[in-house]
């Protein structure tokens, strides 16, 4: 994906919207080409079973999106304020996708936290 753009649900390439700006623990970091547009990660990816990372304006981890075999999101690992889970405190949490719909955030399991905590270093 990266500099080539994202795929639409129909499998066609969309206009170039993203660029790769580096890697974090082996996962490509994406950045919007037009910073004025919505900053969320792409809804589809070119390579099945891919993950991408989004950083905040200060270069700190904001989100990791894991895509499945069908190139649609499986889950998002977020690090930020989430009112239902932690009020105004930044907390790591997960949003699963069920039938393409992003679910409310949930606390991470211990094994999920252990797998993804490397992305939160210096942020907690």
Regions found by a protein language model. Name each.
Residues 2-124:
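Catalytic toxin/effector domains delivered as secreted proteins or via bacterial secretion systems
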């Amino acid at each position: 994906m990266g500099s080539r753009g994202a795929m639409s649900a129909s499998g066609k390439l969309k206009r170039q919207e993203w660029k790769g700006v580096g890697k974090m623990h082996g996962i490509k970091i994406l950045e919007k080409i037009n910073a004025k547009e919505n900053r969320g990660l792409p809804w589809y990816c070119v390579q099945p079973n891919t993950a991408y990372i989004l950083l905040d304006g200060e270069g700190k981890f904001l989100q990791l999106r894991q895509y499945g075999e069908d190139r649609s999101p499986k889950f998002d690992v977020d690090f930020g304020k989430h009112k239902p889970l932690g009020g105004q405190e930044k907390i790591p949490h997960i949003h699963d996708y069920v039938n393409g719909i992003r679910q409310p955030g949930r606390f991470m399991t211990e094994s999920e936290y252990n797998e993804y905590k490397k992305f939160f270093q210096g942020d907690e």
